[in-house]
């Protein structure tokens, strides 16, 4: 995207299995993908794109740490309400067809670590540092220090009660 955001998919509602109901909208920028995306761009020599992605990430993470989302729209949109489009049949009849993603409102502790890892990788890879990155990281670390023991929805994006996930604590 011209904003520097990297979208996970160009499609919505492709089923995890034909006829199933796990048909999500992935047309968003996921913070969990940030480190791997930045690393791939740097390895491939796309330093300008890597810098644009890092800058996009800094804009997304610049708010209050407790409001950090797991995903954003390509231009940093925060409101991603999930709607079902019941009049559409879906791929191979797999319903529902969705737009938006309710997981955007989930608390997933590991994304804080993913953001930290991405910003560390950006510096280690030689991207021009951004002075405000340290302020953002300090705020994220303070939040993590106070909240690391909270249950969350985890990498699995569980729809239901929050739980304790090892992955969330380690990342």
Labelled PLM ranges:
Residues 1-171:
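Acidic, mature catalytic/reactive cores of soluble proteins
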